[in-house]
């Protein structure tokens, strides 16, 4: 037996149950016992407890006795006990209240697991498989609610739950000599339930003779009987998380490294936190992570020389790429329509909400972009969700680019589709993923011009690959329509008919300078969407005033491409100068999108850069988690047709000075 020991306090100090937990120097005592099976190392036993100095001797003795107990399948040949003093104060939480779910047999027990899992994931059987098949990891699987996506960094190791102690018993050191499955599981589950972003936990023990499991959801630990037959060595754990509340790294760090002491369950612990307390806690956690946003208020149109309530600003964060929001022809069309048709649609598209203005907008969009039909809705977000929810369901596999917009991700979640996230613009991986599809149908989902970096997707090649596998292709070109292509028709303009996506999604709130979203598609899909897409059927139609503005904007671009040419010239110049200044990688110098990503790193550095640029009179977006991965914040530059050479020169000079000079000592 090997001890890794450090100097400890007098063992005659009072036991931890009589001490104030906030004034004790707590220690982590860990035991791991190993043996050999078929000449291979074999894990025999392991345990950990946080204890006060006065309980170290008892705890070491109890854990050692457990390691050497004769009941193990394999005899321990080596026992390691380590002691580490904590350098942070533990958080104290109450144990979860407990309930019992009695099931007559494993079939009924596993159906109960599936019923609860189905609240959170589209394919509960896959999560159940982690719980019931042979163990492949020592820790737990972390699964994203809504997508089934596995999030643990190391699939062999899993996510461990460590550094928690027991304040519920008077002699914890002695009690550790014998494993008490239920009590120790409640302690572990209590820490998991307190972690940020955790929604639920499911467990089936891999102990062959312990036939109970548990479900921890809604703040209650429920023991489930007869989850497997006696002698079955299989088991596992699944932790379901909401990545909108906390990212996987934050959750894992909390579970593995944040010390927690679990006290007795109290009356208050058996009740859900009040709504006010719950919402305040979420907001405070968001603020503490440096993620709170405060919008600026404009007093002018979004021209390059804009005015906000904070004063004038040189604007580089607007998606009014062509300046059509102030185009007189667009404004005149809207003014005429409000006098003729009123300011409101008055209903959904299938009741009283469709006007001649809506038909005109759809006709102009479809003809301009080369599709038989267009379906117009209130926003790009709504159009994206409605389209994906119409096309996808649990029998559809969606191959989704890793940098797709949140609206596309949310559409997959609402559709409860089997979603496979592939590396950004990686055609080989997409091809392989389509080869592995086992569902009835498949759909490939991408942006045309990516909203965070401005690079253009290889749409033509992607369509060829997808159609070879019989898959449908949906492209969201919100940032490409009006900005790229010889006449501004977007990322698909120069493609032959055989390489065009089946559905082209777009928005009128960016280059078109108005509002609304749309889907371009064939006659069959358009008719199906108008009858069955929930976002279309059950939402009020956009105002006819908006529809008239969209029709006028499209007509303008159909006959006059000078603004498109000006924008593309500005994008090329800005990318060249930014690359020469080493602010973007050389590969980004040749991207065509009007969005330019300036890598920054930590959220705090991005915010500091944004604030310093604002002091210099420039408005630039600081894009942080969850729009990008945590720790990969960017400054997002949006070019427009109305920026001048001098505007671009000021931008590049200011960025170089701020990022290379004023913030050189900021944390990275």
UniProtKB/Swiss-Prot annotation:
Pathway(s) annotated for this protein in UniProt: Metabolic intermediate metabolism; pimeloyl-CoA biosynthesis; pimeloyl-CoA from pimelate: step 1/1; Cofactor biosynthesis; biotin biosynthesis
Chain positions recorded as substrate binding sites: 293, 405
SUPFAM superfamilies attached to this UniProt entry: PLP-dependent transferases
Reaction it catalyzes: heptanedioate + ATP + CoA = 6-carboxyhexanoyl-CoA + AMP + diphosphate; 6-carboxyhexanoyl-[ACP] + L-alanine + H(+) = (8S)-8-amino-7-oxononanoate + holo-[ACP] + CO2
GO molecular function annotation: 6-carboxyhexanoate-CoA ligase activity; 8-amino-7-oxononanoate synthase activity; ATP binding; pyridoxal phosphate binding
EC assignment: 6.2.1.14, 2.3.1.47
Keywords from the UniProt entry: ATP-binding, Biotin biosynthesis, Ligase, Magnesium, Multifunctional enzyme, Nucleotide-binding, Pyridoxal phosphate, Transferase
Residues that coordinate or bind pyridoxal 5'-phosphate: 380-381, 451, 476-479, 507-510
Cofactor(s) the record lists: Mg(2+); pyridoxal 5'-phosphate
Quaternary state and interactors: Homodimer.
Family, similarity comment: In the N-terminal section; belongs to the BioW family.
Name of the protein in question: Biotin biosynthesis bifunctional protein BioWF
Organism placement in taxonomy: Bacteria, Bacillati, Actinomycetota, Actinomycetes, Propionibacteriales
């Amino acid at each position: 037996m090997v001890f890794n020991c450090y100097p400890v306090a007098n063992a005659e100090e009072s036991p931890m149950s009589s001490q104030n937990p906030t004034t004790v120097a707590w220690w982590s005592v860990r035991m791991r016992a190993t043996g050999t099976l078929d000449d291979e190392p074999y894990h025999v036993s392991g345990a950990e407890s946080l204890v006060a100095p006065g309980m170290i001797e008892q705890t070491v003795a109890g854990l050692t006795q457990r390691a050497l107990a004769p009941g193990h399948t394999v005899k321990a040949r080596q026992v390691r006990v380590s002691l580490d003093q904590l350098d942070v104060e533990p958080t104290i939480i109450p144990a979860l209240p407990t309930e019992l779910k009695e099931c007559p047999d494993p079939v009924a027990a596993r159906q109960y697991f599936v019923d609860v899992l189905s609240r959170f994931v589209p394919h509960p059987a896959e999560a159940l498989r982690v719980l019931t098949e042979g163990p492949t990891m020592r820790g737990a699987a972390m699964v994203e609610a809504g997508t089934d996506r596995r999030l643990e960094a190391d699939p062999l190791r899993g996510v461990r739950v460590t550094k928690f102690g027991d304040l519920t018993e008077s002699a914890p050191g002695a009690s550790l000599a014998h494993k008490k499955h239920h009590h120790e599981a409640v302690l572990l589950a209590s820490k998991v339930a307190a972690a940020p972003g955790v929604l639920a936990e499911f467990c089936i023990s891999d102990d062959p003779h312990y036939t109970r499991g548990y479900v921890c959801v809604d703040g209650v630990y429920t023991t489930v009987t007869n989850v497997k037959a006696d002698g079955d060595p299989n088991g596992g754990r699944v932790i379901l998380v909401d990545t909108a509340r906390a990212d996987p790294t934050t959750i894992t760090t909390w579970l593995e490294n944040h010390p927690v002491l679990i006290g007795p369950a109290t009356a208050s612990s058996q009740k859900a936190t009040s709504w006010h307390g719950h919402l305040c806690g979420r907001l405070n956690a968001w603020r503490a992570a440096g993620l709170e946003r405060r919008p600026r208020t404009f007093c002018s149109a979004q021209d390059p020389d804009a005015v906000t309530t904070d004063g004038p600003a040189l604007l580089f964060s607007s998606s009014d790429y062509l300046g059509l929001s102030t185009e007189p022809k667009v404004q005149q069309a809207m003014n005429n329509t409000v006098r003729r048709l009123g300011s409101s649609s008055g209903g959904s598209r299938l009741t009283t909400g469709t006007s001649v203005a809506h038909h005109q907008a759809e006709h102009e969009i479809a003809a301009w972009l080369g599709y038989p039909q267009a379906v117009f809705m209130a926003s790009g977000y709504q159009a994206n969700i409605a389209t994906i929810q119409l096309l996808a369901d649990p029998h559809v596999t969606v191959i989704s680019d890793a940098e797709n917009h949140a609206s596309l991700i949310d559409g997959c979640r609402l559709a409860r589709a089997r979603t496979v996230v592939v590396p950004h613009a990686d055609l080989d991986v997409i091809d392989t993923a389509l080869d592995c599809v086992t569902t009835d149908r498949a759909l490939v989902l991408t942006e045309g011009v990516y909203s965070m970096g401005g690079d253009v997707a290889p749409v033509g090649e992607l369509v060829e690959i997808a159609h070879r596998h019989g898959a449908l292709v949906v492209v969201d070109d919100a940032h490409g329509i009006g900005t790229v292509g010889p006449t501004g028709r977007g990322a698909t303009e120069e493609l032959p008919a055989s390489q065009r996506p089946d559905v082209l999604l777009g928005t009128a709130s960016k280059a078109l300078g108005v509002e609304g979203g749309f889907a371009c598609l064939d006659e069959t899909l358009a008719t199906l969407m108008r009858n069955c897409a929930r976002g279309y059927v059950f939402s009020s139609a956009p105002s006819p005033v908006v529809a008239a503005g969209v029709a006028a904007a499209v007509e303008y671009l159909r006959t006059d491409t000078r603004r498109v040419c000006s924008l593309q010239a500005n994008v090329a110049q800005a990318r060249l100068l930014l690359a020469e200044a080493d602010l973007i990688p050389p590969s980004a110098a040749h991207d065509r999108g009007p969005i330019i990503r300036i890598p920054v790193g930590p959220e705090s550095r991005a915010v500091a850069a944004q604030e310093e640029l604002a002091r210099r009179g420039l408005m630039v977006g600081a894009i942080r988690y969850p729009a990008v991965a945590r720790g990969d914040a960017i400054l997002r530059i949006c070019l427009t047709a109305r920026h001048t050479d001098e505007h671009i020169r000021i931008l590049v000079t200011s960025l170089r000075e701020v990022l290379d000079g004023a913030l050189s000592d900021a944390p990275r």
